[in-house]
Every structure is written in structure tokens, then in C-alpha cells.
Amino acid sequence: MLIEAQAEQCTFVTRGLCAAAVLCQVEPVGRWFEAFIKRRNRNVSASFQELEDEKESSEESEDEEFQLEEFPLLKTLDPKDWKNQDHYAVLGLKNLRYKATQRQIKAAHKAMVLKHHPDKRKAAGEQIVEGDNDYFTCITKAYEILSDPIKRRAFNSIDPTFDNSIPSKSEGKDNFFDAFSPVFERNSRWSNKKNIPKLGDMNSCIEEVDGFYSFWYNFDSWREFSYLDEEEKEKAECRDERRWIEKQNRAARAQRKKEEMIRIRTLVDNAYSSDPRIKKFKEEEKARKEAEKKAKADARRKEQEEKERQKQAELEAVRLAKEKEEEEARQQALLIKKEKEIQKKAIKKERQRLRTSCKNWNYFSDNEAESVKMMEEIEKLCDRLELASLQSLNESLAVSSKEEGKSAVEKQIAEVNAQLKREKEQEEARMKQSTKGAENSAIGGGSGSKSWSEDDLQLLIKAVNLFPAGTNARWEVIANYMNLHSISGIKRTSKDVINKAKSLQKLDPQQKDDINKKAFDKFKKEHRVVPQSVDNAVPSERFEGPAADMSPWTTEEQKLLEQALKTYPVNTPERWEKIAEAVPGRSKKDCMKRYKELVEMVKAKKAAQEQVLNATKIKK
């Protein structure tokens, strides 16, 4: 709307004549109309069409810019050895190589065909080799490989011009970035991921450096080596031969892939160990930790100095008193040692004197057997007689004749043998008394009121080992455990359990072995496998699984089983087969059975402890 003019302002009015309307027909033309028709036919937006136009124009510009490079050795190539030729060089794309587009490859092939086709050369008067032996076959093979994305990818993976070398640690120490940056840039072409981090420079932060090395330590490579397969499965005459060729090729590819990943890992390791930024970050972190450590150490040192000053006087007094006691004890021990040495030398001298005297008299016999027997008796005297007895015997031998000496020696031998016999009888009587008391104790059960069967004794031993010293309310827990698992029906109190445990500790080792042997014999009797009758008319089945091992588990086997259970979690395929392999001498069935037993033991242990805990809470 126009603003109305004021009173003092002048108003101008312009009038003119308009020509009459004329109807005419216009046809749309031009590149804009053509673009509109394309968008309408393809049902796309204008922005999408602009992107495609830019892409086509960029490809056309690239196609216009590249120039084919003539391969001078093209005519000398052997068509039969086409697999070892450089396909990019054959098509004149030696400089572009893996960067060449499909349009460029097609254009290069077209140009090579126009120039080297046998018909063209024959028309020009050139001598042509008939069949597939002409070098033009190499051009056809090169285009066949490079036009197929899968085959081209395989050839690019073993590009003969690619430099697989990596810098050593010593090369990277002098000029790290110049040595490693082009190598990482060169090897980044094998990555499946597009956003590849750069090596950076000395100003890169620790997050960027960590991200770079994390990417390369987890490098995902698409490089594969199927082009180097020595055997072609298409040449196989039968299915078995084709499978064998495929197996050999897969093994060779896996080995080359492994070597490639080792090469990449070595590159990253060399770079990481030579990277000056890593060294700088480590030094900074070390300095920070040392500063914190020093501050804490200073605080602790000041606190300790005060305590040390207070304890120093007490420690000094204790030290002096201890040194005095040690010196007195040392002097006393030295005196005792000297006395023992003197006595030992005297006994040794008297023993040797006795042996010499008896030897001079040929051990009082001309019979060799009697001499040997007397020699044994003389050695027994040397071992049993005290110093005074040896001296007395030697003095009597020195002043007596052979017969008198023999009588003196035989008398001494008789006394020693009689003493040995008395000691043996006393020991046998003591052992018999101990055995009798242990049997009465085992029958009475310690408390004298409740009998203990062999099953209850074994259950008690198992419970004592299951709940070691230090367990909260240990004997109450053991009593509850026995009451839950005993088949005798007798209820045991903590006092009964303690008395019986003490009586078992006093048993002779031989009696303990007898009890364990009886328990094991009973176990074998209860778990004896009854052989099944086999019908001769029916073929017997073959079971591949090994029989369960009924022998008890050793401590070493138990440790191996526990380690295997940690190593192979529940979601591991074929878990129990792997666990059985980790425990030598045990089958899968043995391991599963032992695991169930351990689970039941743990559940029983928890149940017994919870019962005692609940009873304690109720009393409170």
C-alpha cells in the first residue's frame, strides 16, 4: 500500500497505453530443461542430480587428464606366463595403478585394442602369431583381471610395485616422522575403514596419539592373497581333487595373511618404541607420579621420624639386653660344644681301639663266618656302649689273653643284646596298650554315650577338612553338617564332635591308614560296576567315551580342574572336552562328576553355616 501524499506535496499521475495481448507457442529447450526431464523421469531431487553431475564431470575431467604410458616390453611378454605380468603396465596405467577408475581401465583397453589388435597389425603388414600365443592375449588377460572387481582386488593385494618394507627401530630414532609417516600412509590403502588417523607431529596430544596406535594395533585389513594360489581348482579333474586344491590354497592364503599381520604389527611396534611423543608422555606421567609419591613420602617420613625418636630409647635398651643374653648363651653353647667334641673324639678313639684289638686277634675265631658275625657284634658294641664302658673293655683287653678277651667281649655282647631285647619288649607292650586304648576310644566315640560308625568317622574327617580352623563357630557348623548328611540318624553336638576329633588325632598312623583303607574298600564295593550280560545274537554297541576313573582326586588334579574351570567359562563351545584335556588322566565324565561334587560340597557348607548363624540370631 502506498503512503498517502501530504497536503503540501504534489501528486503526479502517469498514464500510458498498453499493447494488446498476443498468444504465441513456446517450446522449452536447453540444458536446464534437459536436467528437469531427467529428474522427473528418475524421480530425484535437484540437489541429488547436481551431485551426480559433479561426479560425472569430475570423472570425465580425470579421464581427460590421464595419459597412457606405452609398455616397451609388451611384445616380449609370454601369454602363458600372464599371471606374473604387471596388468596395469600392460594397459598403460603404470602410474595410476590402483587409483585408476573403471572408466579409465575401459578407455585404456580400448586404446590398446585399437593399436595392438591382430587384425590391425595384420592389415599393417606385421607378422601375426596364430592362436593364444600372440602377445595380444596378455592385453586381454590384463583387462579381464582389472575389469573384475574381485580379481582386481586380488591383484592389488600383491601389487609388485608396492613396498612392503618397514623402518627399523634405529632408523626411526633419528628422524621418526620422516621415516614412518610415508610407510603408514602407504599401508593405509589396505584398511577396511575409511577414516584413517594420521601419524601427526610433536604437537599432537596424547588422545590423538593413543587413537592412532589403537587403530593400527587393531588394524582391519582387506588384503588377501588368492592371486598367488599355485593351483587352480578349475583344472581339477574331479571333485576330490578340487577339494584338495581348495584346501591347499586356503592354507597358503592363511599363512600369507598371518605373515602380513605380523608385518603390520612389527611396523606398529617399531613406531611405538621409537615415537618420541610416547617417551615424552611417559616421562611426564612418571614425573607426575614421582611428585605425588614424593609428597606422600615426605608426609609419612615426618610422621615416622616422630615415632622413631620415641621408640629409639626403648629399642636401644632391648638391644643391649638381648645382646647380653645372646653372648651368655653363645658362651654356654660354645662350652657345651667343646665338651661334646672332646667326648666325641674320646669315643671315636676307644671305638677304633676296640676294633683294632679284635682285628689283631682275628675276631677270636679262625672260621670266616664266625669272624664276620663277631665283627657285626663288635660294631653293635661300638654303637651302643658309652665312653666309660668302652674304656673299661679296652683296658681289660689290653692286659688279658685272647681267650680272656673273648670272654670279656662275649659277656659285654650278651649284656647289650639283653638290653636290646628288653627295650623291644617294652616298645611292643606300649604299642599294644596304645592300640587297645585307641580301639576302646573308637568304640566309645570320645563322649562314651554315642557309637561312631565308619561312615560317621569318614564324614567327620571330611567335615573337618571342609571347615578349616578359623571358620566362624567351626564345631557347631561341623556338627550341623554331620546331622544333615549322616545316615545313622544320630544327632551330634559340638561337644561330641570335638571329643571324637581329639581322639582321632591321638591315633597311631598305622590305625589311621587302616581306617582310610576300610573306607576306600567300602567306597569301591558300593561303586563297583556290575558287568552287563551280552546277548550273542545282538551286535554289541561300541562306546567311544572312556570309563569313569574311580580313583580319588589328587591335589594337583584338583588345582588343574579349578584352573580349567576359570579358563573356559560357561559359554565356551565344547567346554567339558577342553577341561578334560587340561586335566591329564581324567575324562570328561570324571570332570563333570567332580564339578557336581564340589558344587554339592559348597552348597552343604553354606547351608551348615547359615543354620548356625540363624540359630545364633534366635538365641540373641
From Swiss-Prot:
GO terms for cellular component: cytosol; nucleus. Residues 447-509, 548-603 form the SANT domain. The keyword Transport does not apply. Gene3D superfamilies: DnaJ domain (1.10.287.110), Homeodomain-like (1.10.10.60), Ribosome-associated complex head domain (1.10.8.840). SMART domains: DnaJ, SANT. Residues 420-431 have a biased composition (Basic and acidic residues). Disulfide bonds: none annotated. Residues 86-159 form the J domain. This is DnaJ homolog subfamily C member 2. It comes from Xenopus tropicalis. Keywords: Activator, Chaperone, Chromatin regulator, Cytoplasm, Nucleus, Repeat, Transcription, Transcription regulation. Pfam families: DnaJ (PF00226), Myb_DNA-binding (PF00249), RAC_head (PF16717), ZUO1-like_ZHD (PF21884). GO terms for molecular function: chromatin binding; histone binding; Hsp70 protein binding; ribosome binding; ubiquitin-modified histone reader activity. InterPro entries: DnaJ_domain (IPR001623), DnaJ_domain_CS (IPR018253), Homeodomain-like_sf (IPR009057), J_dom_sf (IPR036869), Myb_dom (IPR017930), RAC_head (IPR032003), RAC_head_sf (IPR042569), SANT/Myb (IPR001005). GO terms for biological process: 'de novo' cotranslational protein folding; positive regulation of DNA-templated transcription; regulation of translational fidelity. It is found in: Nucleus; Cytoplasm, Cytosol. Coiled coil: none annotated. Component of ribosome-associated complex (RAC). Acts both as a chaperone in the cytosol and as a chromatin regulator in the nucleus. When cytosolic, acts as a molecular chaperone: component of the ribosome-associated complex (RAC), a complex involved in folding or maintaining nascent polypeptides in a folding-competent state. When nuclear, mediates the switching from polycomb-repressed genes to an active state: specifically recruited at histone H2A ubiquitinated at 'Lys-119' (H2AK119ub), and promotes the displacement of the polycomb PRC1 complex from chromatin, thereby facilitating transcription activation.
